[in-house]
Amino acid sequence: MEIIESKENKLIKFLKKLKQKKYRDAEGQFLAEGHKFLDYDTVPEIIIVREDIKDLYIEKLDRFECKKILVNEKIFQELSSQENSQGIIIVYSKKNNDLNSLSNNLVILDDIADPGNLGTIIRLCDATNFKDIILTKGTVDAYNEKVIRATMGSILNVNLFYLEKQEIIKLLKENNYSIIATYLDKEALPYNKIKLKEKNAVIFGNEGRGICDEFVNISDCKTIIPILSNTESLNVAVASAIILYKFREIEGLI
């Protein structure tokens, strides 16, 4: 394990840059923090270990043939985004996902703004085996440290695609997806009455504005979760959980 003792080290400077979106985009890499990520099979590029915990996770660290560096607490804090860190930071490469290999069931996220919501939805999609997630360019960066933390490792198990809205519409139409919009409307069906087709794409919208008109206008059906009081609406992550689990139930998978 390589020991780095200076925060002026080139690698440390590079790792600090990965805390910014523009560098994550340019390098195709991102940071994840916490030893739980080492339970996944995805091979890291680099593992950074705080020196005081180096003996706690030897078994996990030995699973991977990759660059490992040992740093003191001061340098580690320069890289960490957590107050009570477990002392492990991992550098992963983003997946090179193929739009030509999409599954028959897609989740579309339209301008989701809150990192916690996005991370929770990614974790949910992993749990319900909706592995392909298409995000509009207005959606928060999925490799943001808060999103990564909320995914609890599920970021490693899903395929993410950031596209312009018109690109998404073209993709769905050309590939004959049944487009289901979660949208409050007189014509909207309760979520448990939806008829699924061979290929389905369900769209969840921005926390404040909901789904954009472009998606509403091209949808094949609209669905709602009935509200039994005067509550205005449900949190988008909660709504996603209810609907995606119901769809898997309709398919007979749970």
Name these PLM-found stretches.
Residues 68-92:
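Glycine/small-residue-rich loop that forms an oxyanion/phosphate-binding "nest" at active or ligand-binding sites
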Residues 3-6, 68-72, 159-166:
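Short acidic-hydrophobic, aromatic-tinged amphipathic segments that line or gate anion-handling sites
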Residues 181-231:
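Active-site/ligand-binding-proximal alpha/beta "capping" segment
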Residues 1-55, 139-140:
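Boundary-proximal intrinsically disordered activation/regulatory segments immediately upstream
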Residues 87-90, 127-128, 147-153, 213-254:
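Structured adenosyl-cofactor binding patch, chiefly the S-adenosyl-L-methionine
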Residues 99-187:
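RNA substrate-binding interface of SAM-dependent RNA methyltransferases
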Residues 71-72, 110, 136-137, 159, ...:
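Short beta->alpha connector loops at strand-helix junctions that form conserved
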Residues 55-64, 215:
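Short, aromatic/basic amphipathic alpha-helical patches
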